[in-house]
Amino acid sequence: ACDDDYFHDSGLANGRHDCTVWEYLHTDAYNWDSTILVIERAGLVDLFDGKDPACPEITFFGPTNISIMQFMYKTVDNDDKVMYERIEDIPVEMCRKMLLSHVLPKKMMKKDFDYENRGTLEGGTYIQALSGTELRVFRAKSSYMGIADIGAESLGIHALVNGYIVGIADIEMNNGIVHSLSYTYQFSEL
């Protein structure tokens, strides 16, 4: 028999934070410090801090630092030279347009989106991002032990023909919801 106790109860994750989206992003430099710099460069701090009267609540499909770094290192000119070595090198309007394509004009939790029709690129919820980009956001159930639709539920986004996976959904703040995009996502305009 085993005498060692290798189980460590780390508790339940708390998806609710008593702060603004802007303040929340500052609590996790590992994932969000580059995102913060892009928001500042785009002049969108008030939007993320809940101080924009035209849009007091938001949903943010958040590109993490890794997503932004991939964009910077993979965006090259005709001579294969990296175009953006620092966030300050990215044009302000590009930062603004890319960020706004990740923002919805209201709070939406995972449960607020419809399911995708399995095996199709249809179903889900169609909604316009603040950039004007039409998004299809959908829930999908995976299989478990060979049985369809009883496994983990995920959240995904389609914009035109590109599809992206949400890494962590339903992080709620006072003025918004953050759905953190997976580390495989490369920051772009959706």
Predicted regions, residues:
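Bacterial Sec-dependent N-terminal signal peptides
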Residues: 1-25, 190
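Intrinsically disordered, low-complexity linkers and terminal regions
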Residues: 3-11, 34, 76-77, 93, ...
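Post-signal-peptide N-terminal segment of Sec-exported extracytoplasmic proteins
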Residues: 20-57, 62
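Structured segments of extracytoplasmic/periplasmic soluble domains
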Residues: 24, 28, 38-45, 71-75, ...
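FKBP-type peptidyl-prolyl cis-trans isomerase
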Residues: 35, 61-68, 170-189
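Short, surface-exposed loop/turn segments at secondary-structure junctions
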Residues: 48-51, 78-86
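Short active-site loop/helix that positions an aromatic residue
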Residues: 66-81
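Aromatic/histidine-rich interaction motifs
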Residues: 81-166
